[in-house]
A protein has these predicted regions:
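Short, well-ordered helical secondary-structure segments
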Residues: 19, 30-31, 108, 118, ...
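Glycine-rich loop(s) and the adjacent beta-strand/alpha-helix scaffold that form part
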Residues: 52-55, 59-153
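Short, intrinsically disordered, charge-balanced linker/junction segments flanking boundaries
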Residues: 161-170
Length: 170
């Protein structure tokens, strides 16, 4: 697949990694640090979201806990929910978005029926075929020799390319 994020990710393809200027980096270094001083962005750490509050099906507030104190923050334009493959569906469900048959039984007021919320967690299967080859220069031959490692290192240092730019799971 050319892009694992298109929704049709059957097949195989190159892994996407976060990099900046040829260096692997965390999401915070690649995306958050460059914008964290914006006046329209507030980053709150050590918080646990209780729920999102809606007004006419538009997200307006987020209730969150820090230690034992409940806070509410409101947004003028948008709220971005980015709490992972388990946290995001859980927050949506406690906020009233999901399968009504499940949420009503828990006493959660329905905001929007969306049956797929919390129902589509998939394992990320990775299959590594192993082949024995002859008379072909392979990456394994390079990385299993001191000279090969030196060449790999130099290619990365001078060109920001080669095996050292690949994700660990490639």
């Amino acid at each position: 697949t050319k892009d694992f994020n298109t929704g049709d990710n059957h097949g195989c393809g190159y892994f996407q990694v976060t990099e900046k200027n040829g260096f692997r980096c965390s999401t915070a270094v690649g995306y958050l640090n460059p914008v964290k001083k914006r006046s329209n962005l507030k980053i709150i750490t050590k918080a646990h979201v209780k729920k999102i509050n809606f007004e006419n099906k538009v997200a307006k507030e987020v209730e969150y806990w820090i230690e034992n104190k409940l806070f509410t923050v409101s947004a003028d334009k948008e709220i971005i929910l980015s709490s992972g493959s388990i946290g995001s569906p859980q927050i949506l469900q406690v906020s009233g978005i999901g399968n009504p048959n499940k949420l009503k039984g828990l006493g959660i007021e329905m905001i929007h029926e969306l049956n797929g919320v919390g129902e589509n967690l998939q394992d990320h299967l990775m299959f590594r075929p192993i082949y024995k080859i002859q008379n072909i220069k392979s990456l394994n031959k390079k990385i299993n020799s001191l000279f090969g490692n030196l060449l790999i290192g130099l290619e990365y240092i001078f060109n920001r390319s080669g095996p050292m730019t690949m994700g660990a799971s490639q």
